[in-house]
Amino acid sequence: MSINSYADNRPGFVCGQFNKNIIEVPGEYVFPFAEYEGYSYFDPRFIENKKGCEANFRVLPMRMSWSDLKPSNEVSNDVKIIEVYAEPLKGNPEKYLSYRKYVYLDMGYLKRKGELYYDEELDLYFTEVTVTIRRSIGHKDDMYFNKKGYYWKEINNEVIFLIECEWLPIDEKYHKCFQYFLIPEIGTKVKFYFDAKELSNSNIMREKIRIFLLDHVKN
């Protein structure tokens, strides 16, 4: 039996709950598999976890093509893929992303934050954060610099969504990003990964993913 098919689900669908909201999606979207509350994936008792529409999701991972949001596990230069991870939202949704921004940008003494800019084209705030890491190679110490770029949107001093992009030193450009956003009405936080070249489309991606999940709420 497939890990994505359970006795209390419709055949070919994956079902579970986020904060008492039942979500059911076609199994072709789910990659590699949904995790439910209970034992960790690394625990042999993982297979004993309650599954299906009455169980709580720990994470619902999905892969889909852009821009039609069709299920896709294909690895090809001709197919643009976005990876989506939906998890239960815990705590106050009004402060969640503001705190997440603080953690990414300010927490930790090894971080060096760049100047704050406002990107007029994207209509987003932007700054860079560099973490200096000392590495021992043989008998020598080497300094490694890990740089990431952050974009975010604020309304009434609250962060609405947050984007992190990884810097690729060898190419001297950002190459992969993820965006965090919330869907409070179904008690869900969402992270999705996309190519940095699609940054200008990330607002459309977020809205399409939000609608996709809301459309798959099971009444």
Placement of each model-derived feature along the sequence:
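Long, compositionally biased interface segments
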Residues: 166-219
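Short acidic/polar mixed-charge low-complexity motifs
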Residues: 21, 158-159, 186-188
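Short, Gly/Ser/Thr-enriched beta-strand-loop segments that form substrate-interacting elements
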Residues: 146-147, 152-175
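N-terminal export/ancillary region detector
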Residues: 1-152, 156
